[in-house]
């Protein structure tokens, strides 16, 4: 058994950092050591920022985004096209689409995907909120932007079925050849999706 070389406070910091996605035990130790070495420049301000986030962060009651105000900044942005809603699995997907700056639409965060094996059903996701938003009127298009996994496709089909009968256009992100990708390196599933989603030139 390895000997302890730090106090319990530092060990706790390392253990908590190791729970952050992308950080394993070794990376967490390095991060903790770096924070401690830069106590005034990093550890103090980080501790303060985390305390503020803990106190102020909330989930938007309209779209499911994470913000310090409710409704969130995206929902209250008067320059956005609120008639187009992009449906995403998670807040990280919303942020990724915003970085791409390809559309100035509204969003709806599901909070995951349908996964019967993991016990995740429709009531565990924010699907009812989406149906309510569409039912209120003013929405002309729903863009389903979930991951191209079996669970993602199942979720997309379920949402499409639930929105049937409402006057709204339903589209999904195209799947296939990435920009700069070479056909020889793509798997069969990706090539099949690309062929099926082909567009006119």
UniProtKB/Swiss-Prot annotation:
One Pfam assignment: RecR_ZnF
A GO molecular-function descriptor: zinc ion binding
CDD domains in UniProt: TOPRIM_recR (cd01025)
All copies of domain Toprim, residue ranges: 83-178
The keyword DNA repair is assigned to this record: yes
Domain of life: Bacteria
Alphabetized UniProt keyword annotations: DNA damage, DNA recombination, DNA repair, Metal-binding, Zinc, Zinc-finger
Entry-linked Gene3D superfamilies: 3.40.1360.10, 6.10.250.240, RecR Domain 1
Ranges annotated as C4-type zinc finger: 60-75
InterPro entries xref list: DNA_Rcmb_RecR, Rcmb_RecR, Rcmb_RecR_Znf, TOPRIM_dom, TOPRIM_RecR
Coiled-coil ranges per UniProt: none
Biological process, per Gene Ontology: DNA recombination; DNA repair
Family from the record: Belongs to the RecR family.
Stated role: May play a role in DNA repair. It seems to be involved in an RecBC-independent recombinational process of DNA repair. It may act with RecF and RecO.
Protein name: Recombination protein RecR
Organism from which the protein derives: Rhizobium rhizogenes (strain K84 / ATCC BAA-868)
Taxonomic lineage from the root: Bacteria, Pseudomonadati, Pseudomonadota, Alphaproteobacteria, Hyphomicrobiales
């Amino acid at each position: 058994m390895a000997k302890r070389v730090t106090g319990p406070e530092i060990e706790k910091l390392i253990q908590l950092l190791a729970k952050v996605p992308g950080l394993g035990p070794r990376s967490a130790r390095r991060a903790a050591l770096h924070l401690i070495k830069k106590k005034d420049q990093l550890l103090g301000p980080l501790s303060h920022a985390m305390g503020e986030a803990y106190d102020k962060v909330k989930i938007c009651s309209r779209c499911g985004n994470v913000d310090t105000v409710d409704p969130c900044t995206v929902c209250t942005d008067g320059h956005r096209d609120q008639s187009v809603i992009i449906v995403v699995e998670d807040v990280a997907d919303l942020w990724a689409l915003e970085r791409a700056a390809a559309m100035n639409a509204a969003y709806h965060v599901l909070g995951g995907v349908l996964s019967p094996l993991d016990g995740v059903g429709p009531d565990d996701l924010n699907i009812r909120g989406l149906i309510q938003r569409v039912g209120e009127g003013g929405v002309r298009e729903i863009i389903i932007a979930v991951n191209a996994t079996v669970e993602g496709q199942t979720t997309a089909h379920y949402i499409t079925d639930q929105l049937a009968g409402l006057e709204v256009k339903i589209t999904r992100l195209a799947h296939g050849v990435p920009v700069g990708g070479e056909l020889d390196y793509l798997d069969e599933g990706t090539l099949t999706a690309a062929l099926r989603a082909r567009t006119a030139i």
